[in-house]
Amino acid sequence: MDDKASVGKISVSSDSVSTLNSEDFVLVSRQGDETPSTNNGSDDEKTGLKIVGNGSEQQLQKELADVLMDPPMDDQPGEKELVKRSQLDGEGDGPLSNQLSASSTINPVPLVGLQKPEMSLPVKPGQGDSEASSPFTPVADEDSVVFSKLTYLGCASVNAPRSEVEALRMMSILRSQCQISLDVTLSVPNVSEGIVRLLDPQTNTEIANYPIYKILFCVRGHDGTPESDCFAFTESHYNAELFRIHVFRCEIQEAVSRILYSFATAFRRSAKQTPLSATAAPQTPDSDIFTFSVSLEIKEDDGKGYFSAVPKDKDRQCFKLRQGIDKKIVIYVQQTTNKELAIERCFGLLLSPGKDVRNSDMHLLDLESMGKSSDGKSYVITGSWNPKSPHFQVVNEETPKDKVLFMTTAVDLVITEVQEPVRFLLETKVRVCSPNERLFWPFSKRSTTENFFLKLKQIKQRERKNNTDTLYEVVCLESESERERRKTTASPSVRLPQSGSQSSVIPSPPEDDEEEDNDEPLLSGSGDVSKECAEKILETWGELLSKWHLNLNVRPKQLSSLVRNGVPEALRGEVWQLLAGCHNNDHLVEKYRILITKESPQDSAITRDINRTFPAHDYFKDTGGDGQDSLYKICKAYSVYDEEIGYCQGQSFLAAVLLLHMPEEQAFSVLVKIMFDYGLRELFKQNFEDLHCKFYQLERLMQEYIPDLYNHFLDISLEAHMYASQWFLTLFTAKFPLYMVFHIIDLLLCEGISVIFNVALGLLKTSKDDLLLTDFEGALKFFRVQLPKRYRSEENAKKLMELACNMKISQKKLKKYEKEYHTMREQQAQQEDPIERFERENRRLQEANMRLEQENDDLAHELVTSKIALRKDLDNAEEKADALNKELLMTKQKLIDAEEEKRRLEEESAQLKEMCRRELDKAESEIKKNSSIIGDYKQICSQLSERLEKQQTANKVEIEKIRQKVDDCERCREFFNKEGRVKGISSTKEVLDEDTDEEKETLKNQLREMELELAQTKLQLVEAECKIQDLEHHLGLALNEVQAAKKTWFNRTLSSIKTATGVQGKETC
């Protein structure tokens, strides 16, 4: 980590981090017991939070060095504040109390740099609070590590906040039941006084925050389980008995260990103000210096499946990168002096564009490998770098030939015998070129090396936790370049401000000393402009605008004096339009709406410049954002509107300044006024002839106002066009801070384009002493880098504008210089030898001819290449046409065959229909015949049954009569008993039996004949059913053929036949 604070160490095997309970991470207060608790959470008394003074808030406040109090929570009444303390190990200054931010619904977020606004947290009144407890005011730029590509899975209440089993169980439940995952960015502070923040990845706004001292336990999912890419932490809520667990999932699984390590670091470290001393710490007997040689190598995809080292420019000492090509970062770490220290692992490889970047601006790269080299002398770390990521857009755009970019690479190493991780920071220069550019210049070595001096202090035996713990702690870490810079800064030749003295002239900015060797120019669009203004000034401007609106054609008298002090930011949009005379610009507004619909011939140049316009301003830095879209429309509309000039490089800066104060239509109108009415477009005409006249006027003014600087520029052959071109063409809008740019535009719109001379002379006059000490290269570098940085202080910019306004440069004098220039040009033309002129013209024409020939060759080559490509495409198209023709013929033949098959199937279908009709009619007739036969037999049977019943009844009646007659006869009565049975005479009985048997036999014969006829009828019915089955079989075969022909109507007909046949068959049964 960096030098500002120290960090703790976490074991590789550790899956969880707890502020009070972990074998790898036990935090002990200096006031507490020196023997840390090592239980695993089974004993509540040992793992509970210990509060000084037995829980008394007053006693706790007296013990605390810094107190964090909860702000009032109006939206969550009834929840109480929980103030407990962690017990910090060794380095902590004491226990810390904390606040919990209220968040009922958390919207998770991925990781970008967090810039924390300066704020003061009010003290929440409570019982026992005393006046001695002051609120904690966080630092404006909180030192933190930001992690992106995280997903928030949710939170839940837990009863055992330090139980790893409970935490893993809740992690599994939330991961499996999560239906709506939310992307978040997590910011983890580097000190225990900090706050963990959840940020929105799009707007970078804070969603929720959790103070470190409220976080009780951290845990990650076990390897080999679905939760291996998840981690969680528990925090105490407002009620002392309420604990919540928050679960997150990482898109990059390796980042889980890095996040847990950041939490462990925050638990260990106290926010001590330990800036790096300007002088090295004195050598003590118990300290040692270890020297490390760290080399950086960048590799690019060579298109053949391998990565090759990128070249390094021998003169500029910068890497040359190709745009949009995948890269790898390779770091070689080798210890060169002192006792060898064992590097355990690398837990972070980070990269960021720029120089002197903050920790929160560094972006984590994916680690591919780490370990000892083949010879065992160095430790090698390799990481993959995707340059197309939005974070690295600055180092993925083509760099102008005269510029270089800075890039910062950091590697975090865990050294076995060192208590804290060590961060080696490498700042290198890079240039980005086209992906198709060939590398043709000679190169030196393809890596850059920096020596680092790590000063360690051995920890005393009694301060260690055990015998196997770390042996050293970091005192300071310094690179060789920092040492050289410090020596240069402290040398007597460098002018340092005397203590206690304050100069009235514009002082050198305080950052000049530390950025003297910084070759990176100030980004355009930098500098915050405040809209605050004194009430008296606003009242004065309000009265002036009221009078002005009464007559817009006449400017108020006091306008010039007010503009010289600067127009209030809130009024600039309106005042600029009035100064430019755009109060009647309806025709330009309508014209603009038409122009943006037309095509511009300079579209590519506009698009290229827009990406470079105000990259430091939030409104324009997003590619494809609203700011760049509006800026593109304005530049495109003007290029179509002014066909003679079109779009010229630098116009986008002026358009961006206007766009920051007014809508697109009004900004376009003011831009047109500045270009035409103020004469800015004249500078671009006639091969920049008027611009060269301005350069001559500036040099003549320098000769009059700053003669010594003018003579110095003559001595070093520095001409005005070498440093002032951008001043005139962009009106100082390209490089200087915005508050200074806006003030210059105020003066320009009020007094005209001659204001440029006032500002230019002011810049030269205030920088005269520095410029007199420079040579040609140094002067150019000063104008490009140091000069804009001098005015990052708004006070310096105001003094410069006061100086510029006080300079009296009359128009008469400028006219005089203009005449001198034209006279000089005429004299040069007259005095010039015609032969020399013709030779120069001849050389120019030859160069133009060579250029045209080269262009012709290029076009011819492109034409040949295009013809070859077109011939190849034509051959491919012809082959494809032949194949399609063959396929068409085959398809046509298949269609003819299919039509013939269709006709054949239709004929067969008609025959089947006819056969089905015949068989159906025959079956119906058979069924009717069988039905009539069955009905006749049923009728006969019923008649016979009736006849039998009648005969039986008659027989019974006759028998009864005979019985009565016998009863009446005295002789016959003896032959019968009381039941009517014959007593004795067997012959009579036999006769009667014979008569009865004959009658029965007759009936049986008749019944047998009827049964035989019935059996014959059933046999005929069975034969009819067999025939029906045969018909159904034939119908089934026909059905298959019909189905093949996809005749669905035939299926319905056949089904109706089956249904009818089946119903009638059941009736016959």
From Swiss-Prot:
GO cellular component: centrosome; cytosol; microtubule associated complex
Superkingdom of origin: Eukaryota
Compositional bias annotation for Acidic residues: 510-520
Alphabetized CDD domains for the sequence: PTB_Rab6GAP
Record-listed Phosphothreonine modification sites: 996
InterPro entries: Kinesin-like, PH-like_dom_sf, PTB/PI_dom, Rab-GAP-TBC_dom, Rab-GAP_TBC_sf, Rab_GAP_TBC_domain
Domain named Rab-GAP TBC: residues: 566-752
Gene3D superfamilies reported for this sequence: Pleckstrin-homology domain (PH domain)/Phosphotyrosine-binding domain (PTB), putative rabgap domain of human tbc1 domain family member 14 like domains, Ypt/Rab-GAP domain of gyp1p, domain 1, Ypt/Rab-GAP domain of gyp1p, domain 3
Site label Glutamine finger, positions: 649
Keywords for this protein: Cell cycle, Coiled coil, Cytoplasm, Cytoskeleton, GTPase activation, Phosphoprotein
Modified residues (Phosphoserine): 42, 360
Location within or outside the cell: Cytoplasm, Cytosol; Cytoplasm, Cytoskeleton, Microtubule organizing center, Centrosome
GO molecular function: GTPase activator activity; small GTPase binding; tubulin binding
UniProt site (Arginine finger): 608
Segment forming the signal sequence: none
Stretches assigned to the PID domain: 142-298
PROSITE patterns on file: PID, TBC_RABGAP
Subunit organization: Interacts with RAB6A and tubulin gamma.
Note on domains (UniProt): The arginine and glutamine fingers are critical for the GTPase-activating mechanism, they pull out Rab's 'switch 2' glutamine and insert in Rab's active site.
Name this polypeptide is given: Rab GTPase-activating protein 1
UniProt source species: Homo sapiens (Human)
